[in-house]
């Protein structure tokens, strides 16, 4: 019988645009933990560093709750990047005008999974 165990981690209101983080998340979805960390470490993007922290946190949660689990047995089940809070600022322009500057944040949700066979 195959039993799935899932462990999660969330990063809320992280200072990066979701539009820039989603392509990075697509690169690691479905990969093993070791490969995902290798891919994220090699990327120079700010979003990759944020995603790396959340993935490491999810793997750490998994290894904390299941002592028999190793890094090789973990893979990335799901990565979700959603819009976070937006900070709007006024940007003064010429001739007394003003533009709005929107700073976007994102929420990152990572779910890791481990599979093991149970006989009986």
Curated annotation (Swiss-Prot):
Which InterPro entries does this chain map to?
Answer: Ribosomal_uL22 (IPR001063), Ribosomal_uL22_bac/chlpt-type (IPR005727), Ribosomal_uL22_bac/org-type (IPR047867), Ribosomal_uL22_CS (IPR018260), Ribosomal_uL22_sf (IPR036394)
Q: Which keywords label this protein?
A: Ribonucleoprotein, Ribosomal protein, RNA-binding, rRNA-binding
GO cellular component terms?
A: cytosolic large ribosomal subunit
Name one molecular function that GO assigns to this entry: rRNA binding
Is the ATP-binding keyword given for this protein? no
A Pfam family of this chain: Ribosomal_L22
Q: Which GO terms describe its biological process?
A: translation
Keyword Transport listed? The answer is no
Looking up NCBIfam families in the UniProt record yields: rplV_bact
Family that this chain belongs to: Belongs to the universal ribosomal protein uL22 family.
Q: Which PANTHER family match?
A: CHLOROPLAST 50S RIBOSOMAL PROTEIN L22-RELATED, LARGE RIBOSOMAL SUBUNIT PROTEIN UL22M
Q: What interactions and quaternary structure are annotated? A: Part of the 50S ribosomal subunit.
Q: What does this protein do?
A: This protein binds specifically to 23S rRNA; its binding is stimulated by other ribosomal proteins, e.g. L4, L17, and L20. It is important during the early stages of 50S assembly. It makes multiple contacts with different domains of the 23S rRNA in the assembled 50S subunit and ribosome.
Q: What is this protein called?
A: Large ribosomal subunit protein uL22
Give the species this sequence originates from. Borreliella afzelii (strain PKo) (Borrelia afzelii)
* Name of the coding gene: rplV
């Amino acid at each position: 019988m195959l039993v799935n165990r899932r462990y999660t981690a969330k990063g809320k209101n992280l200072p990066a645009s979701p539009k820039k983080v989603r392509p990075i998340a697509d690169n690691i979805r479905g990969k093993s933990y070791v490969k995902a960390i290798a891919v994220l470490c090699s990327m120079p993007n700010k979003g990759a560093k944020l995603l790396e922290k959340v993935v490491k946190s999810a793997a750490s949660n998994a290894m904390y709750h299941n002592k028999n689990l190793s890094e090789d047995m973990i893979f990335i089940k799901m990565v979700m990047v959603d819009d976070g809070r937006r900070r709007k600022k006024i940007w003064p322009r010429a001739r007394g005008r003003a533009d709005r500057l929107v700073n976007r944040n994102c929420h990152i949700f990572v779910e890791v999974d481990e599979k093991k066979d149970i006989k009986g």
